[in-house]
Regions:
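A glycine-rich beta-to-alpha transition motif near the start of alpha/beta enzyme domains, typified by
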Residues: 1-121, 173-335
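Transmembrane helix-loop-helix hairpins in multi-pass inner-membrane proteins
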Residues: 123-125, 131
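Active-site glycine-rich loop that binds ribose-phosphate moieties when present
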Residues: 133-135, 139-160
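Flexible, active-site-adjacent loop/turn segments at secondary-structure boundaries
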Residues: 136-138, 165, 204, 291
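Internal active-site segments that recognize and position negatively charged phosphoryl groups
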Residues: 151-182
Length: 335
């Protein structure tokens, strides 16, 4: 038998598959088909998910393991901050370690166990890097600028300013009013910039942020390859960096920032060290279900409730209790 774990960070949900425990690793095509099968919100297992997190042997010296991120549409993301926290917890428990590095597509990133947010709400801190601002890194074009940092971009939305940051996933960020973050614009701009458009040829994650107060934000994200998600760890990290750079009177380097999102909350700390930016992302790493399945069913992307054994952990109830009194927005325009 093989194992899957249903997990979430700020209710950005995933299945974890540890390929090092399989007799035969899945091919890239099999991983893509499995991700599309498991994560479908209509027909997938346990109501679907936002992606599949694949654990492999490390590819760089000094790392404990490698994490790959397969989106719900079968595309591969270079990183996932919320997913990395859950993989960090899995590896910490698998190998009995508290601090270590995990390989991602672009870098080996430091992770560590943190104090629980609440009873049965375990938390992990993960490094989010590298950071790039140049248009080739995202990429974008035809916007009249080589970089966007609080820049008016009338081609996208005449009334807003935008920042573009690859961290390493590409993110477009705008600080907006509560009315705008609750309204339909993000649900229009996100699909447009992730379809055939003249500006972002590879698509882009689009983040709207509302400043609640000093060191307090609310962030809503339309994710490339997924759509609206409850939270996006790299999006929150990129938004926190833009917040410190553009709104220094409200947030500062090396100070904790509380970031609320539709799925809960996280904390970030923005750093500038050795002439490089990086962000520390701290949040929950919740396991909701353990799943036992025949390895052949993984290879054939035929996992369903009838051919696997599912055990709930009880951690979701603790998480829901934790977020019960957090600030909430009326996000009625969810697409």
């Amino acid at each position: 038998m093989a194992n899957l774990i249903k997990v979430h960070g700020s209710q950005n949900s995933f299945f974890i598959l540890d390929q090092t425990k399989l007799k035969t690793a899945l091919t890239d095509d099999q991983l893509r088909k499995l991700a599309q099968h498991l994560t479908n919100h209509q027909t997938g297992l346990l109501g679907g998910a936002d992606g599949l997190l694949v654990v492999n042997k490390p590819t760089r010296p000094g790392a404990l393991a490698q994490m790959r991120v397969i989106n719900a549409d079968g595309s591969e993301a270079s990183m996932c901050g919320n997913g990395l926290r859950t993989v960090a917890r899995y590896l910490a428990e698998r190998d009995q370690k508290k601090s270590f590095k995990v390989d991602t597509m672009d870098a080996s990133l430091q992770v560590r166990r943190e104090k629980d947010f609440a009873p049965d709400v375990p938390a992990f801190a993960v490094e989010i890097s590298p950071v790039r601002f140049n248009k080739e890194a995202l990429p974008f074009d035809n916007l009249g600028h080589d970089r966007l940092l609080g820049t008016p971009v009338p081609e996208l939305a005449p009334q807003l300013t935008f920042s573009a940051i690859a961290i390493p996933n590409p993110h477009l960020i705008s600080f907006v009013s509560q009315k705008v973050i609750e309204g339909p614009l993000l649900g229009e701009l996100g699909p447009y910039l992730n379809g055939d458009n003249p500006y972002f040829s590879d698509g882009v994650n689009v983040n709207f942020a509302h400043i609640i107060g000093p060191n307090r934000l609310f962030v809503r994200t339309y994710e490339r390859g997924v759509g609206f998600t409850n939270a996006c760890g790299t999006g929150i990290s990129a938004t926190s960096l833009a917040f410190v750079l553009l709104h220094g009177d409200q947030g500062a380097f090396d100070e904790p920032i509380t970031v609320y999102n539709p799925g809960g909350m996280v904390k970030t700390v923005v750093h500038y060290q050795d002439r490089r930016y990086w962000v520390e992302l701290v949040g929950n790493a919740t396991f909701t279900h353990h799943i036992k399945v025949e390895e052949a069913d993984l290879h054939q992307a035929s996992v369903n409730a009838e051919n696997c054994t599912i055990t709930a952990t009880g951690e979701q109830a603790a998480y829901e209790q934790f977020i019960r009194h957090l600030p909430k927005f009326n996000l009625s325009q969810r697409n």
